[in-house]
Each structure stands twice: as structure tokens, then as C-alpha cells.
Amino acid sequence: ESADYLYDPKPSGTRWMHSHFGLQEQNLLAAPLIIRDKAAMQEDAQEVVLLLEDFSWTSPEEIFANLRKPKKMMSMGSSSDKEVGPDLNDVEFDAFLANDRTLDDPEVVAVEKGGRVRLRIINASASSNYTIDLGALEGTLIAVDGNPIEPLSGKTFPLAIAQRADIMVTLPSDGSAAAVLAHCEGRKMRSGIILAPKGATVAKIATMTDSEGPEIGLAQELQLRAAAPLAAKKTQRRIPVHLTGSMSSYIWNMPIEGQGGMPAVVSAQQR
């Protein structure tokens, strides 16, 4: 059964759809949802969508049960001089996927020699952050979470869980292939795809690296500027939201202050 709907698709941009029922997202129930505006459709660039996911042979229910088991407490009187690093990952995944594939058999996308490519990258992982590594390519970040920004250039870009990044790249004029890699935060594993013009040599890329993926911080976030920012307007209302939770029970909450668990009611155009 099918149905046709006519509507104004706003907002446009790189979006994604995924289940919020139980733990289905960990079972890879997610897909890209790309809404193109007129400018994107008229753009002189090839589009390549990259969906990143983390995968485990262990069932999501068992993973969640293990996370909620009582944790061993570290002795405060420990004589060890070893520095304790940040707790970056709670789940040991078996693989990291780029468009459903690992680097053992990556997707090879046909592109034009010297052509422009708009990468629409989606972090659909349940519990993993990444650093996007363009290797020898120089990229220009033009949109984040589907929203256009003032261009930001670089070779690496952090991508947190559920985030999206639109990155423009220009392929080498010599016709060589280029890899777009996603290195998992705090892990030596990575995934990615290959952009390859006709006749290009596609070299084998190892899944494992010598070093762990870097910790994701807020440095890039602080540089982001909206291409079309909200109009200046005095704040009319403030709604405090608390981030709470417990590692021991693995329960996390975002209660709105003073609402007793009820939603805050707002009105249209209210700032």
C-alpha cells in the first residue's frame, strides 16, 4: 500500500530517520533522509551520502543489561601512579560500518576526476563518536545538522552521535582515489568509503590503526556560525533544563526545572 503526499518540505538539509522504540536503533534501524532545496539541486557537485553505524554481535538487550550491572568502585587509596584517562566508550563494538560495510570490503563510489563532491555524513551510531579524516583532501564544512553555516575549512572534522556534516571536497586532478574515513573516538578501529574516478587504483585500507581516535571536544562547535542566523530579539523566557543521571544504574534524564515531569508550554514566535 502506498500514498502520495504534497507538502512543503521544510527544513531542508541532511536529516535522518531512526527508531525510538526500545533499542531498535542499535539493531541498525536507521536511514538517511535528504531534503534538497533548490540551491542544492542546482549545485555543480556530486552528492555522496555516508551513514555511520556501530555494530555488535551481542544483542542490544544484553548490552544494556551489562551496562546496568553494578560497577566496581576504584579504591581511593590506590598506590598506582598510572594516569586515569577519560571514559570515552561504554560498549565494545565488533565493527564500525560505513553504508553497511567495513573497510574489509568498503563501498567504492564512482566520481569524476577533479570533480567536486558534497559529502552528506550522518552519525547514526548508538554509542560512538568519530573524527572524519579526509586524508590528503581539503574539505569545507558547509552545513551542520542540516543547517547551512559559514564555510569552515579543514582535513578532519569531529562528528558526535546523531550529528550530520555536509563537507565539500574536490577530487585530485591526477585521477587518484581518495578515502573518507571515520576514526572512532577512543578506539583503534575506523570505517569509511573510497571515492574513485574511473581507472583509479583502490588500495587496501586497514581497519585497525596504531593510535586511538581523538577525544571529541567543543573546539569546532565554538567556531560554527549560522549562514542565516536568527533575527536579533530580546529573550522573553528562560527554561532551565538539568542534565542528570547515574553511571551505576545507567539512567539519564533531562528534567525541566519546576515542571514536575510535564513539558514546558511555549508559544509561536516566543524567544
What are these regions (language model features)?
Residues 1, 134-161:
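Solvent-exposed beta-strand/loop surfaces of large extracellular or lumenal domains
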Residues 1-16, 20-22, 153-158:
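Aromatic/His-enriched, Gly/Pro-containing loop or helix-boundary segments
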Residues 9, 21-23, 122-125, 134, ...:
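Non-cytosolic beta-sheet module surface loops
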Residues 14-16, 118, 177-179:
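Short, conserved beta-strand segments of beta-strand-rich sandwich/propeller modules, principally
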Residues 27-68, 149-271:
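Extended terminal and domain-junction accessory segments
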Residues 48-115, 122-125, 244-246, 250, ...:
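Acidic-aromatic/histidine active-site loop/patch
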Residues 115-119, 270-271:
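Structural beta-strand segments of beta-rich domains
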